[in-house]
Amino acid sequence: ASDFFGKHNIQNCLAAILLTYAAGAPLDVIRQVLKAFKGVEHRLEKVRTIHGVTYYNDSKGTNVDASMKALEAFPQGHLILIAGGYDKKTPLDDFMALAAKRVDTLILIGDAAERFEAAAKKAGIQDIRRTGYSMEGAIMLARKIAKAPQAVLLSPACSSFDMYDNFEQRGRVFKGIVNAI
């Protein structure tokens, strides 16, 4: 599956291979399923590439640990990260330290923006922007500043409840805006 990446996803995939093989599934069937598998919606989901900039929906990144896994899937960096939402008040030091290594621009949305900005500055992130409660504003800002080979990643590290009913709705809104560009 060419759009399937990230160390945590590979670990899950290997576990599934071992379990299905141990249960008696033939290797050719396992291989066919793996080739067809495109990942799971809202989990490091590749949405679209526009002028060499690829947009990823990781709306399921509803906590710091999940969003750190998403950042770790981009060891080369070159990211514009859209983060924020309903603030769970979790510690941000490790998340922002990793973001400082991988993220060129941090775009913050929602209730958590102020606290996330303070933590990002403390971690040494230079380019921090805020777009209030506007996903469209965040995406349009990312589109304006992104240059190939950068990627735009929505991985909020927050719940969605300040702006959306759930992470699925947030992810669908993100994809809808990106696909309308």
Describe the role of every protein-language-model region:
Residues 140, 144, 162, 173-181:
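Phosphate-binding loop of NTP-binding sites
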Residues 164-167:
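Short, solvent-exposed loop/turn segments at secondary-structure boundaries
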Residues 153-157:
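Short beta-strands and strand-loop turn motifs
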Residues 2-104:
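Nucleotide phosphate-binding/pyrophosphate-handling subdomain across enzymes
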Residues 93-150:
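C-terminal helical cap/extension that packs against the catalytic core
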Residues 115, 160-162:
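Short glycine-rich, flexible loops that bind phosphorylated cofactors or substrates
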Residues 21, 69-72, 97, 118, ...:
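Short, well-ordered alpha-helices that flank and scaffold nucleotide-derived cofactor binding pockets
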